[in-house]
Each structure stands twice: as C-alpha cells, then as structure tokens.
Amino acid sequence: AVRSPATLSNLGSGFDVFGLALREPYDVVEARRISDRKVVIEDIEGPGASSITTDPTRNSAGIAARAVLELAGAGFGVALRIKKGIRPCSGIGSSGASAAGGACAANLLLDRPLRSEELVVCAARAEQATSGSFHADNVGPAVLGGFTVIRSYEPFEIHRMDPPVELGVVVTMPDFLVNTREA
C-alpha cells in the first residue's frame, strides 16, 4: 500500500510551479496484479467516497495506474482499493493524491520500476484527464514529498527539496466544496 499526502500548490508567485506535501491528511492506495491487462477499482472508502467514480477511465488513481502500466509495457493489469483521507474538492490536492497513489502503487508491482519523475508525469496526465489541464504542482509533492519546484513543463523537469524543519503550516478549510474545474 502507498500513502499519498495532501498538498498545497499555487503558493505565492509559484502558480502551477510550487508545491508542498503535508503530513496529513493522506490517501492510501493498495494495488495488486490481475491477469487481465486492465485497471479496475474495487473499492473506494472514506470522506466523499460516494461522490468519486470507480470507473478507472475517469478516476485519477485509475488513469495514473494505467499510464504507469503503459509506460512500463507491463503485461498485467492492476486492481486498486482507495482509502480517501482527503475530502474531494477541499483545495488540498485530493485528486492529485489519488493520482500519485495510483501511479506509485502500480509502480510497486513492476519488475523494473519507473523513475520518480516518470511517476509524476503519469500522475499529471491523470490530473489533466480529470481537471482539464496538465499540471504537476499537486502530484509532484504527492509523489516526491517535501517542497517541489517545476523548472520546466517542456521538457518536464521537477526539483525536490526538504522544507526547513522550523516551517509550520496551518491549513483552514471552510465547510464548502469547490470543484477544481470551477476554481
């Protein structure tokens, strides 16, 4: 199983460039090999789970897992189970955490795992499919942890650094939801 953290993005002047992984909340994504060369989502539980599709072609974890399998040329499929700890539409990277979790969980099953940067790209493609734009400011820190800076999207280049241990973050979440496409 993979634990994939909530993230903050669009920090200061770093629109679609800066991202920061939080310690919590987080999603947990479990993956297992299946003989059919497809991705299935067996279960989603947790806050807002009833609003999240189990269709792997429309779910960010399913799309990211498929992207990993295709990039690696895997000869098997993946069944996913998702435990949401991050409420959807909360503004702290819920779909990005699921995408990162799907990519990383599928990667654990490969005989030759992909590089971290490739996982970020697979997760960003899932975000593109669900939100409408290719951006890695949430999935980057969800995959890599820490603070990330995207140096370039073409060609893709991302850098990770540890934030200062003295840095504290307070996240306030109002009790209403905003879909990323509408934000």
Regions found by a protein language model. Name each.
Residues A1-S90, L108-R112, G145:
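ATP-binding N-lobe of GHMP and related small-molecule kinases
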Residues G14-G19, E24, G96-S98, S116, ...:
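Basic, gly/Ser/Thr/Pro-rich low-complexity segments located predominantly at protein N termini
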Residues V28, G62-R66, A100-N107, V120, ...:
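Predominant activation on well-ordered alpha-helical scaffold segments within soluble catalytic domains
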Residues K38-D43, I92, R160-M161, T180-A183:
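Short, charged, solvent-exposed linker or helix-capping segments at domain edges/interfaces
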Residues S90-S94, S152-Y153:
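Short, conserved acidic/polar surface loops in the N-terminal third of protein domains
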Residues I92-S116, V143-G145:
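DPxDG-like acidic metal-binding loop motif
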Residues R115-A183:
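ATP-dependent small-molecule kinase catalytic core of the GHMP/sugar-kinase superfamily
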